[in-house]
């Protein structure tokens, strides 16, 4: 049998590293279909840290896409599992038949599903991508993204799958003993990426709570983002006093980020699509409720797991936040489907489907 090849088609270092390490640590030992990767980006020690994997690195999207297409044409039995994607040439290859539907399996990461960019080149490309998506052999995604995708592509098979967020299950009960009182701390956004709409989010928080809360804005990732960070900082200072605004410009290591999240009382995410599932998982694990945009379909996954959801359109105050915290504390977090290690079963099934081992 031809071994499944996994494709990380865009240079997104943080996400790519997370996926590679997850496969190395949790999947490669038990499945031959979890070991072969083609990745856009630099090695940067990944080969050494993932010895169970065979990883081929490419300098850019174009070179990777050309290599994938060549493999697909040379052997029509070869199957590919595309994680995320963000690679126009691969979509065009699927549309034109360079890659066949039976070869193309896609794990949706959120951004590659939605059509939120206003640039002309994106608006021209989106209809083509939409046509190509009708030809995907099977999509894997969150419950909300599956629902969103099915509205335009009802005939494409969909399977539930969650991004492998790095989590320590032993921390699931840690938050229950913590007493929350005094001035609330609100986390705004999950990174420094503009998709977080930081300025609009800060204004929304201020409209709800005024200058009575402390706001923390993590913006250490992606790098080389100084101008936008300063723009957000200045906008924040127009709304909040200096002691109530903390804009973080340095990238935090995982343990430091975890400690930061656990000092918060609420997460506030204004973006109108599914993203930031890693941060959401870590907040929920710590007993911290989240405010979502109603257009973010991940609320469907949260309600399915009996988790409280607050929306940006709700009238929020401290009492409502504290009640959501109380409800979250009563949830058995060891049963949440998108938590580690529960999402592992979905990955094992996804591998079997993509490799053709199960129908």
UniProtKB/Swiss-Prot annotation:
Keywords: Cell inner membrane, Cell membrane, Glycosyltransferase, Membrane, Transferase. It catalyses: beta-D-ManNAcA-(1->4)-alpha-D-GlcNAc-di-trans,octa-cis-undecaprenyl diphosphate + dTDP-4-acetamido-4,6-dideoxy-alpha-D-galactose = alpha-D-FucNAc4-(1->4)-beta-D-ManNAcA-(1->4)-D-GlcNAc-undecaprenyl diphosphate + dTDP + H(+). One of its GO terms (cellular component) is plasma membrane. InterPro entries: WecF. It is an enzyme of class 2 (transferase). Its EC number is 2.4.1.325. It is found in: Cell inner membrane. GO terms for biological process: enterobacterial common antigen biosynthetic process; fucosylation. Its main location: membrane. Pathway: Bacterial outer membrane biogenesis; enterobacterial common antigen biosynthesis. It is a peripheral membrane protein. One of its GO terms (molecular function) is fucosyltransferase activity. Belongs to the glycosyltransferase 56 family. Catalyzes the synthesis of Und-PP-GlcNAc-ManNAcA-Fuc4NAc (Lipid III), the third lipid-linked intermediate involved in ECA synthesis. HAMAP family: WecF_RffT. This is TDP-N-acetylfucosamine:lipid II N-acetylfucosaminyltransferase. It comes from Shigella dysenteriae serotype 1 (strain Sd197).
